[in-house]
């Protein structure tokens, strides 16, 4: 290997392959075309998207399953098109590598007035913009340092679980660099243990555990980002305390455990308020992920487990590897001293469904979402789009080893359709390498509203082109129902154009009888829903399966109905003035 060389582009792509990227998303453009010539020779699969925004969303979805994803765009127009997706990945800690093909070094150095710029010779503006949504950036300009710079940036992506940007000029693509660097893998350096801080933190946490009377556990979404999942689940099983997740954390805990009660919502407010200790793993306290901070416990009754620190009350113990700390905490628990919390919580699996007539129209208030739990199975990847689906999926009881994406903080509507494309590709890549729960035909299931679907519908064509196995439940409630609940329930700005949604698959190239099938269903009544959920072609088939569910425009999950009712009260009060 000594003395051997390879093009810089292949060094970058082979590094991504080593880190677990098998498929790379993007859109070709004149500054990245020669770069893309090296994708397949490097061992990667190219997935071309309809636009850069969707490519970024897809890379984000891929990264949440495979722990890293990558997207390629062209300089300026392409990268700015993708920046919304990159910002969302930054906000919700998805490790995405954004690779940007840029003009030749000579053009940049001479400040040439060329296309995709502001025509003023300033090539640094886009670098500055990207600094706000990435944790590390580099523009490769020197073949001697380029490999080490690539390694440095990729390490930052892994270390912080957030996006990075690598810009590669056209004339740097073929530059030869040593192969030798690929012989050593990029790995997060092991944290140096801090024995005194560990002991102090363990003693502080154990003291709070043993002295509590009414404890609970909350698992939040940043648990996913830093390799804590297995240890957190073991801790929950060992201690046996009532456990909830945030919306962002749903799918990260085994919901079949008897002490796991699903997503903590305002319905559990009285219980949460009564607790004198809340252990929070991977906290992410945005207003939308915490029901306007209801889930954020007061300092005096909380222990927060963050990636590099433990906070007990107001005391913060820093530089502690949280995964190792949780393992030590579990081992040192004295079961005889752990308090039991007597409560009247009912496990979701024991809750009864409302009685409905088969001929009645389906409604979200009639237990619509709860009826999907028997349909779900081990290995499913489930996505609930911002809007009514994002709240509805809270009601699912997930089987073990199931993943669920739902809105947390960024809430860019339309994200989930391209994210389903990315997640399904990650699922396929894992199946191909026999790393996916020994399953050969797993499913990606998307729940999305009509308004969100219209935002990014083009990627349905990519799902079809890539022959992915995706199930889509499209909630047709005639517009932006979540916005109607917030404000303007009868305003035209919350309407969307009526589409023939079930014709979309045919328009985008699928057919009913070919190798890659697209199957469609329509649901209006409870009998329709029961029939569709028991259809083996939907549950066990392959290809694209799409179900259009018709609902009233002001039908929404409970939490949104509360907002709608408040809006009506305000309108009535205003009318009396």
UniProtKB/Swiss-Prot annotation:
Cofactor(s) this protein cannot do without: a metal cation; thiamine diphosphate
Taxonomy, superkingdom: Eukaryota
Top EC group: lyase
Pfam family of the protein (one): TPP_enzyme_C
An MF annotation (GO) of this entry: thiamine pyrophosphate binding
InterPro entries: DHS-like_NAD/FAD-binding_dom (IPR029035), PDC/IPDC-like (IPR012110), THDP-binding (IPR029061), Thiamin_PyroP_enz_cen_dom (IPR012000), Thiamin_PyroP_enz_TPP-bd_dom (IPR012001), TPP_enzyme_TPP-bd (IPR011766), TPP_PDC_IPDC (IPR047214), TPP_PYR_PDC_IPDC-like (IPR047213)
Ranges for region Thiamine pyrophosphate binding: 388-482
Residues that, per the record, bind Mg(2+): 450, 477, 479
The protein's Enzyme Commission number: 4.1.1.1
Annotated catalysed reactions: a 2-oxocarboxylate + H(+) = an aldehyde + CO2
Cofactor note: Binds 1 metal ion per subunit.
GO biological process: aromatic amino acid family catabolic process to alcohol via Ehrlich pathway
Keywords (A to Z) from UniProt: Decarboxylase, Lyase, Magnesium, Metal-binding, Thiamine pyrophosphate
GO cellular component, one term: cytosol
Residues binding substrate, per UniProt: 30, 116, 483
PANTHER family referenced in this protein's UniProt entry, alphabetically: PYRUVATE DECARBOXYLASE
Family, as annotated: Belongs to the TPP enzyme family.
Assembly notes: Homotetramer.
The protein's name: Pyruvate decarboxylase
Annotated organism of origin: Aspergillus parasiticus
Gene: pdcA
């Amino acid at each position: 290997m000594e003395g051997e060389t390879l093009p810089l582009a292949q060094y970058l792509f082979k590094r991504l392959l080593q880190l677990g990227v098998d498929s790379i998303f993007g859109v070709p453009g004149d500054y990245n075309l020669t770069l893309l010539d090296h994708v397949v020779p490097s061992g990667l699969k190219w997935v071309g998207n309809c636009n850069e925004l969707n490519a970024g969303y897809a890379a984000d979805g891929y990264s949440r399953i495979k722990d890293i994803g990558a997207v390629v765009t062209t300089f300026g127009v392409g990268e700015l098109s993708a920046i919304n997706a990159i910002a969302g990945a930054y906000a919700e800690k998805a490790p995405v590598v954004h690779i940007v093909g840029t003009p030749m070094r000579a053009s940049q150095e001479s400040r040439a007035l060329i296309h995709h710029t502001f025509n003023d010779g300033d090539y640094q503006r886009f670098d500055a913009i990207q600094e706000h949504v990435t944790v590390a950036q580099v523009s490769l300009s020197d073949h001697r340092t380029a490999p080490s710079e690539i390694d440095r940036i990729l390490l930052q992506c892994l270390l912080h679980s957030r996006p990075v940007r690598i810009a590669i000029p056209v004339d740097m693509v073929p530059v030869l660099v040593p192969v030798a660097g690929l012989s050593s893998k990029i790995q997060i350096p092991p944290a140096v243990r801090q024995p005194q801080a560990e002991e102090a933190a363990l003693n502080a946490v154990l003291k709070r555990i043993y002295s509590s009377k009414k404890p609970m556990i909350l698992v939040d979404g940043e648990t996913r980002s830093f390799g804590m999942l297995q240890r957190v689940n073991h801790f929950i099983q060992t201690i046996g305390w009532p456990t909830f997740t945030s919306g962002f954390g749903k799918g990260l805990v085994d919901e079949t455990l008897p002490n796991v009660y699903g997503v903590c919502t305002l319905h559990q407010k009285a219980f949460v308020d009564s607790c004198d200790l809340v252990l929070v793993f991977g906290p992410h306290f945005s207003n939308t992920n915490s029901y306007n901070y209801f889930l954020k416990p007061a300092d005096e009754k909380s222990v927060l487990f963050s990636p590099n620190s433990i906070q007990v009350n107001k005391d913060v113990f820093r530089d502690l590897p949280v995964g190792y700390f949780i393992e030590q905490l579990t081992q040192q628990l004295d079961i005889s001293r752990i308090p039991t919390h007597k409560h009247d919580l009912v496990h979701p699996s024991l809750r009864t469904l409302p009685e409905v007539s088969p001929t009645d129209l389906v409604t979200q208030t009639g237990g619509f979402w709860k009826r999907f739990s028997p349909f779900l199975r081990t290995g499913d990847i489930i996505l609930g789009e911002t809007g009514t689906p994002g709240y509805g999926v809270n009601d699912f009881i997930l089987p073990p080893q199931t993943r669920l994406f739902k809105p947390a903080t960024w809430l860019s509507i339309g994200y989930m359709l391209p994210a389903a494309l990315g997640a399904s590709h990650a699922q396929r890549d894992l199946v191909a390498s026999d790393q996916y729960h020994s399953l050969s035909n797993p499913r990606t299931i998307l729940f999305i509203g009509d308004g969100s679907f219209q935002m990014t519908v083009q990627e349905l064509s990519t799902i079809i082109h890539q022959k992915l196995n995706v199930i889509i439940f499209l909630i047709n409630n005639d517009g932006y129902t979540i916005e109607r609940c917030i404000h303007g329930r009868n305003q035209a700005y919350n309407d969307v154009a009526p589409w023939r949604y079930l014709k979309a698959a045919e328009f985008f190239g699928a057919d009913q009888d070919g190798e890659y099938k697209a199957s469609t269903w329509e649901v209006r009544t409870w009998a329709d829903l029961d029939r569709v959920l028991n259809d083996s072609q939907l549950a066990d088939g392959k290809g694209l399966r799409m179900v259009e569910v018709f609902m009233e425009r002001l039908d929404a999950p409970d939490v949104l109905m509360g907002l709608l009712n408040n809006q009506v009260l305000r309108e009535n009060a205003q009318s009396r003035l």
